[in-house]
């Protein structure tokens, strides 16, 4: 029991930097879109990627792509890559994977959401407030899909 407590005490997670890596806003049908009744269809795609920069130092990138259509036409497309540099130590591989695949993106999401909201308003469209994302559930789903894919490939071999 003391050994488990000691291992948890040695775990370390620090945010070194949160930064905007890439950004894009396109409104291909403006100003005509401003003349139409606003009934948007919002589609959110997201992805995360991580890589080790040095011993215990990781870059995590959260990519968000928001496509909003109105009357079957694209009103705007907004892409943001929100990055973070994190120092992580004292974690086993499964804990580290969760930290980089769920915990860190959860930290980055509010920054990306604010950037998207700001871009949309600057494009003079109605404000867009993205709902919170459950990165833990997405990560668990990813792990489950990976396990199923591994099982299928093992059965075929």
From Swiss-Prot:
Q: Name one GO biological process term.
A: protein folding
Compartment list: Cytoplasm
Which cellular component, as a GO term, is one annotated location? cytoplasm
One Pfam family linked to the record: SecB
**For this UniProt entry, what is the primary localization, expressed as one broad class?**
cytoplasm
Single GO molecular function: unfolded protein binding
Q: In which domain of life is the source organism classified?
A: Bacteria
Q: What does this protein do?
A: One of the proteins required for the normal export of preproteins out of the cell cytoplasm. It is a molecular chaperone that binds to a subset of precursor proteins, maintaining them in a translocation-competent state. It also specifically binds to its receptor SecA.
Q: Which NCBIfam families match?
A: PRK05751.1-4 (NF004393), secB (TIGR00809)
Q: How does it assemble?
A: Homotetramer, a dimer of dimers. One homotetramer interacts with 1 SecA dimer.
Q: Which family does it belong to?
A: Belongs to the SecB family.
What is the name of this protein? Protein-export protein SecB
Origin species: Photobacterium profundum (strain SS9)
**Which gene holds the coding sequence for this protein?**
secB
């Amino acid at each position: 029991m003391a050994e488990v407590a000691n291992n948890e005490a040695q775990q370390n997670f620090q945010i070194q930097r949160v930064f905007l890596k890439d950004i894009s806003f396109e409104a291909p049908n403006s100003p005509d879109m401003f003349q139409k009744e606003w009934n948007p269809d919002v589609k959110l795609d997201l992805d995360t990627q991580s890589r080790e920069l040095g011993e215990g130092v990781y870059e995590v990138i959260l990519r968000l792509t928001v496509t909003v259509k109105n009357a079957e036409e694209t009103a705007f497309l907004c892409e943001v890559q929100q990055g973070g540099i994190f120092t992580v130590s004292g974690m086993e591989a499964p804990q580290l994977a969760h930290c980089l695949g769920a915990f860190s993106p959860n930290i980055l999401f509010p920054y990306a959401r604010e950037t998207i909201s700001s871009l949309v308003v600057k494009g003079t469209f109605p404000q867009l407030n993205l709902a919170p994302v459950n990165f833990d559930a997405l990560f668990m789903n990813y792990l489950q899909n990976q396990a199923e894919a591994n099982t299928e490939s093992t059965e075929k071999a």
